[in-house]
Amino acid sequence: PVTKPMFWERMVACLLTTQQRSGPNTAVSRFLRTQPLPLGYEACARQDDLGEVVGKVLANFGGLRRTTTIARELSANLTYLENGGWYPVLSHLHEIILHPDPETERRAADFIDEKLKGFGPKQSRNLLQGLGLSRYETPIDSRITKWLNEFGFPVKLTANALGDHNYYAFVSEGFQRLCEACGIMPCVLDAAIFSSFDGDQWTEENAVW
């Protein structure tokens, strides 16, 4: 089962990787490999002013962007979770474990997108992927659209429109249908495309998840 600390740390990772480089040798990856994680759940839950603490921790680490925004988002998300949000969030994730299918994953991703600050269609699926719960609903970004265009997707795709929920759903559905026709799970093809862009830079030592 997904625990609160596990969910929280993956959520922190998702917010940190938004709009900034997160390859194996970046500041984001170095921060997330820090043990224990400076912004772990137990440490954050006992803060009276989480936003201020997060801002200082991220700024002092250095090399990280959007520190003020991330601080505000984490503070808002903790408030939501601690005031009744944990139950529906964890229930959606538990439902995926019980019924692993595209619809269940999509409902969970949409719920996260709706309820948590800093999350859109891509990062909500990033969170599911980080928790090991995403088989069908994968994070789609410019790498995926570039690969699909080169592969011969029937419609010319642009990553700039992926923030629109309907457009994202359209691309995701096409990606899943392609995978079904090829007899491969979407999460596997996603990983293959991802690694083809980063080469062999990721190792067991520098992996974040």
Q: What kind of feature is each model-predicted range?
A:
Residues 86-90, 110-114, 131, 162-176:
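Charged interaction scaffolds used for protein-protein
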Residues 1-11, 59-70, 180-184:
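Structural motif
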Residues 16, 103-156, 193:
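Catalytic DNA-binding helix-loop module of base-excision-repair DNA glycosylases/AP lyases
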Residues 35-116:
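Alpha-helical ds-nucleic-acid-binding substructure associated with the helix-hairpin-helix region
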Residues 9-22, 73-80, 129-130, 188-199:
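Short, hydrophobic/amphipathic alpha-helical patches that form generic packing surfaces
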Residues 2-38, 154, 169:
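Extended cationic-aromatic binding surfaces that line active-site or macromolecule-binding grooves
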Residues 162-209:
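A basic, often C-terminal nucleic-acid-binding module that engages the phosphate backbone, implemented
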Residues 18-28, 81-89, 134, 153-154, ...:
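Short helix-capping/linker segments at secondary-structure and domain boundaries
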